[in-house]
């Protein structure tokens, strides 16, 4: 009777291990973007995907294929581009030197946070 209870669990572990090893064999070990973003935004934004032409692509692919900065709202060449577009205040370049555009981020340094914290009045 105990073996009947263990059999489904063993099958589950076998299937989980099979999926784990299958994913490791893909490029970079992660499931690539590719879902549609017609009605909802990209679900895979946590792994670096963004919507372009109603399909989710990796951010570095969007930047590498771009001919102008206007092709995506997060593309930039300087910090001023990000500020002007309103998409952040920091333009981060990609590690690949062949990609001429960077990606806009909203970044706040600890110095600004400390400065604001020191402005607070002390009440007793």
Curated annotation (Swiss-Prot):
Keywords: Disulfide bond, Knottin, Plant defense, Signal. Disulfide bonds join 33-49, 37-51, 42-56. Contains 3 disulfide bonds. This is a cyclic peptide. It holds the Pfam family Cyclotide. InterPro entries: Albumin_I_a, Cyclotide, Cyclotide_bracelet_CS, Cyclotide_sf. Residues 60-124 form a propeptide. The keyword Signal applies. Expressed in stem, shoot, root, leaf, seed, pod and nodule but not in flower (at protein level). GO terms for biological process: defense response. There is a cross-link at residues 29-59 (Cyclopeptide (Gly-Asn)). The keyword Phosphoprotein does not apply. Residues 1-28 form the signal peptide. Belongs to the cyclotide family. Bracelet subfamily. The presence of a 'disulfide through disulfide knot' structurally defines this protein as a knottin. Probably participates in a plant defense mechanism. This is Cyclotide cter-A. It comes from Clitoria ternatea.
């Amino acid at each position: 009777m105990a073996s009947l209870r263990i059999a489904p669990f063993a099958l589950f572990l076998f299937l989980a291990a099979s999926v784990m090893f299958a994913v490791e064999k893909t490029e970079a070990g992660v499931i690539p973007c590719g879902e549609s973003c017609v009605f909802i935004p990209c679900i895979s934004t946590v792994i670096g995907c963004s919507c372009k032409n109603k399909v989710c692509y990796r951010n570095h692919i969007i930047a590498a294929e771009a001919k102008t900065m206007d092709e995506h709202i997060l593309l930039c060449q300087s910090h001023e581009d990000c500020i002007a577009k309103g998409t952040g205040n920091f333009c981060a370049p990609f590690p690949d030197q062949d990609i001429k555009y960077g990606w806009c981020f909203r970044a706040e340094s600890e110095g600004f946070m400390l400065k604001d914290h020191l402005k607070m009045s002390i009440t007793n």
